[in-house]
Amino acid sequence: MQHNTFLPNDAVEEQKQNPYYGILRAVETDLRLGQRWCELKVHVLDIDLKTKRPLLSGIPVNGQLKDKLQYVLPLYLQETISIEFLSSVFDSMKKLSLPLVKDARGLSGDEFFLYLGIMCSDSTIVYYKITDGLIKPRQNDEE
């Protein structure tokens, strides 16, 4: 049986009681239909005692990230994030034993990264790469 890419991911629908369901669904829809990612999965991160945040993982089918597992943390534009928050996100990912994606340009070679999927007030979603550590800037001729 072939999966209909126009239907929402069942794992997203299971998160209807999560306060971040709206942004999760918007980012998942953009990744699935707009960016054409496949194998989308929802993970739930325990950021602190009272905060459970959804995290999406998937594989882009074209572009520079083709066939490489990626993670996206859905956020609203008006949310305030801090270095401590981002650190707790990476720590939560490690606790779930998720296969983390490394950035080879990192100073130690062990820097992990994910993308923030930020939804603006007009429903536009922008993606920012966040790294757990320091990396050297990318040159124009590098991928």
Swiss-Prot record:
Keyword set, alphabetical order = tRNA processing
Gene Ontology process terms (BP): tRNA-type intron splice site recognition and cleavage
Keyword tRNA processing appears in the UniProt entry:
yes
UniProt cross-references to InterPro entries, sorted A to Z: Sen15_fungi (IPR042777), tRNA-endonuc_su_Sen15 (IPR018593), tRNA_endonuc-like_dom_sf (IPR011856), tRNA_intron_Endo_cat-like_sf (IPR036167)
Q: A GO CC term?
A: nucleus
Q: Has keyword Translocase? A: no
Which GO molecular function terms does the record list? nucleic acid binding
The family line of this record is:
Belongs to the SEN15 family.
What binding partners and quaternary form does the record give?
tRNA splicing endonuclease is a heterotetramer composed of sen2, sen15, sen34 and sen54. Interacts directly with sen34.
Q: What does this protein do?
A: Non-catalytic subunit of the tRNA-splicing endonuclease complex, a complex responsible for identification and cleavage of the splice sites in pre-tRNA. It cleaves pre-tRNA at the 5' and 3' splice sites to release the intron. The products are an intron and two tRNA half-molecules bearing 2',3' cyclic phosphate and 5'-OH termini. There are no conserved sequences at the splice sites, but the intron is invariably located at the same site in the gene, placing the splice sites an invariant distance from the constant structural features of the tRNA body.
Name it.
Answer: Probable tRNA-splicing endonuclease subunit sen15
**Which organism encodes this protein?**
Schizosaccharomyces pombe (strain 972 / ATCC 24843)
